[in-house]
């Protein structure tokens, strides 16, 4: 892991394990989670590492992937993350979650994530995303790189107001870890294929229903979530009960 500084900024360091070792690690996690074992790394046009996390709606998916960002940073030093969402409404919701959980994660990880919503007219944020050594999170909706409007095409164009660089090249130079929120809502045609331009180190897919399955490493359905909440509640009740003499 770790973050490499190549002069232009701090990018995610490459994955060190071989594909065989990676698959073994995935199988270990699957075994712990009582999930079917993968026979191979499921590769896509976009990345050679594609992990599926299956979580029902309402089970804290956004919280889970924000925590994953901090854990990956703590354990492997990776610091460049892009959360890809299917709509502007979800994009705003994710940004809000990053904002309201900041203090909570600061207590555990002693750092804050610098996050921003990608906007082709405000590329100074992207500049900071590359040059900053801390945890950096970009939130982008698929329309921003997949629609045909003038503003949406800017991501692929050499821009005078961006030192004659293409935003997509600056993004790709970071070798970001991609987090796809509800990928099944973005799997129309070439949408996800165009993520190859981001040159991701790996792709993590968080969804209740995966149309296409890759290497599944976690599954939490509504019943599991309910039971876990119940267990939490019961243990809290147990702790808070005053001890009575017999």
Q: Model-derived features: where do they sit?
A:
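Conserved RecA-like ASCE ATPase "motif II neighborhood" in helicase/translocase motors
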Residues: 123-128, 137-175, 186-193
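Walker A/P-loop
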Residues: 47-67
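Post-DEXD/H (motif II) to motif III coupling segment of the RecA-like Helicase ATP-binding lobe
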Residues: 188-234
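Single conserved hydrophobic/aromatic residue that forms the stacking wall/gate
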Residues: 238-246
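Conserved nucleic-acid-binding Ia/Ib motif block in the N-terminal RecA-like helicase ATPase lobe
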Residues: 95-136
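Walker B catalytic acidic pair
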Residues: 181-182
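Conserved Walker A/P-loop ATP-binding site and its immediately adjacent core
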Residues: 79-102
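Walker A/P-loop NTP-binding motif
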Residues: 63-77
């Amino acid at each position: 892991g770790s973050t490499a500084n190549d002069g232009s900024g701090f990018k995610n360091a490459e994955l060190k394990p071989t594909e065989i070792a990676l698959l073994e690690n995935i199988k270990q996690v699957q075994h712990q989670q009582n999930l079917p074992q993968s026979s191979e790394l499921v590769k896509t046009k976009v990345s050679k590492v594609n992990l599926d996390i299956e979580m029902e709606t309402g089970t804290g998916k956004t919280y889970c992937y924000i925590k994953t960002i901090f854990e990956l940073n703590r354990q492997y030093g990776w610091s460049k993350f892009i959360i890809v969402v299917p709509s502007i409404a979800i994009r705003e919701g994710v940004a809000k979650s990053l904002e309201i959980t900041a203090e909570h994660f600061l207590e555990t990880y002693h750092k804050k994530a610098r996050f921003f919503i990608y906007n082709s007219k405000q590329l100074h944020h992207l500049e900071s995303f590359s040059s900053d050594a801390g945890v950096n999170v970009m939130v982008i909706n698929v329309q921003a790189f997949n629609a045909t409007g003038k503003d949406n095409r800017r991501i692929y164009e050499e821009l005078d107001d961006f030192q004659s660089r293409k935003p997509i090249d600056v993004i790709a130079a970071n070798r970001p870890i991609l987090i796809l929120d509800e990928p099944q809502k973005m799997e129309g045609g070439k949408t996800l294929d165009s993520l190859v331009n981001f040159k991701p180190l790996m792709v993590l897919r968080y969804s209740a229903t995966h149309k296409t399955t890759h290497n599944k490493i976690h599954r939490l359905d509504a019943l599991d979530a309910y039971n876990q909440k119940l267990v939490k509640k019961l243990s809290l009740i147990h702790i808070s009960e005053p001890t009575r003499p017999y």
